Every structure is written in structure tokens, then in C-alpha cells.
């Protein structure tokens, strides 16, 4: 009897496999193929110029895809408290859309005050739904910098002064965002705890302090939450800018923690071609904008990892080893988001999101 039941089960399984339609296109377009197989297949079809093209912005909030292969561009958006209104392609002015509203979610300091991981999951899920509805691939949040000085005007964006609490609350937020096919870009990595002269300040920190206070929430987001993206910060850590800081990005993040996602620069945070290429930056955003200001529309080709990168490869200054790693990470992000196998259309602002925002705010009033 058991043997007959086993054979029947096998037969049904084989029949189900045979009934599945055979995919007749390239592996990278097959939604049912493993992500890594899709990545390697797409990478093998790309030119050096196309790979380099993916590593820099093409507009204020998007980076390039590979149109020849049907691989879409990557769209970034602020968080972490609501989806940013659309802006013009090359300017910071709003585009004037009438369908780009968002729910105003509570500040993350309020979320942390709930001490409730279910609330954090609700927050991430809700904001992730709105990001996906607006066709955004990377949500620039959550922020988990530690509150170390009351003079930091962005303390409200973070989850407080306790590394333990921040580490517990960031995980469900990240998971909630990413189950919608949107990458949570955890920021600002790392030791970015003041706004005054943030682009020149040098945070001199010993290893014990770094690992016990400033990194636990980032580590939890990566290793427990499975974060798909990390944003580098404007400041220097021990004398090197953080958007291409070898110790932070190569040794700790991608080495010790095994992070397989993308590192995105804060807007205008990339300062040097060679360091960016060799020290772990994957997508360069906002260069020549001084972080917040306007820029010429043709400046994208002058980014540190744009034409200078391509020129350096042609001259033999750089190998394609680092480039292939960057392209793999970007492709992996695309196949996890806009080209993921399970389509997700998200939800526009709705009563459920209004209720979620109010419930989280009420729970955080302590």
C-alpha cells in the first residue's frame, strides 16, 4: 500500500512538472530560474560599457538599466517616512504630478518608542506597498544612525540611542519593505551622527566602539533582515570617506557580514574614482549636486564611475573584476525587485495605511 502511494505521488509530481510550460527565452528573462543563474546569464551578455553604465545615475533618482537586453533602470526614492513626490528628471523641483501622494508615516524615533516589532513590520509593509505602487525599486531607508548628540537635526529619523533597540526594530521594517519587491536601503553607513559639516567631519572611532555602538543595527539589518541595499554616508571614518571606505564596505559589510546587495552613495557622497571603484561602492548617485543643489543635465557622464571608469579600463588602470562584482550586485537587486518572479503592484494611499500610521503613532506616545 505504501509503495503504491509513493509511486502515485511520484507520478503526479512528474505530471505536474511536464505540464509546466517550457520557457523558450534566455535564462535571465526566465522568472522561474534561480536569481544567481539569471544574474550570470545577463552578465555574460553585457558589454563593458553597459556594465559601467549601471554604476551611475542617469537622473536625479534613477540609475541605468540595459535597454538592449530589456533590463529596466533602477528607481530610487526617499523614505524613510513616506514616498517622495516625483521630481523633474534633472532638477529637484517637483514634477507637478497629481497621483504621487503618500501616507505621512510617523518618524522612526516614534516607531522605536513602541518597542513593538509587529508595529515595525506593519510600518515596513505599508510603506513598501506605496513604494511598489509608485514603481520604486529602492527605498532610501530606514535610517539607523545612533543618537549621540542632541544637536543632530535628523535624530528624529533614526531609532534612538540604543544599539540593541535599533537592531531589534530595524529587522521587521526591512522585511516588511522587501516582501513587496522593494529594496530597503539602510542608511547612513556609518558613524554619521551629526549634520554640522557632515561632508567634512571625520569620525575617529576605535574598533570596540564601532562594533558595540555604531554597527549593531546595520549588522542586524543585513544578517537578520536580509537587507538588499546600504547607503554610504557623507562623513569620513578614520580618515576615509564612507562611500568608498575600504574597512567599512569591503572588509566589514561585504566581507565579515556577507552582504550580497548594492552599496549606494548618498547624493554627492562619492569623491574619488579609484577609491569608489576599488573600495566597494556599487551605484554612484548625485555627484556634482553638492548633495542637494542643481547640476547640468550632461554631468552624469562625468561621474567618478562613469566615463573616467571606462577610460581607466581601456587604459589598463582597472581590471573588470570589480566591475563584474558591481554589475552582479545591481542585477541581483533588479531581479529581486522590478524583475522578480512574483508580480506585486503595491497599494496607493488607502484607509489601511492611514490606520497603520495612526496606530504606530499612538503606540509610540510614551
PLM regions: where:
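Glycoside hydrolase catalytic-domain context in secreted enzymes
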Residues: 17-366
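Bacterial Sec-dependent N-terminal signal peptides
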Residues: 1-24
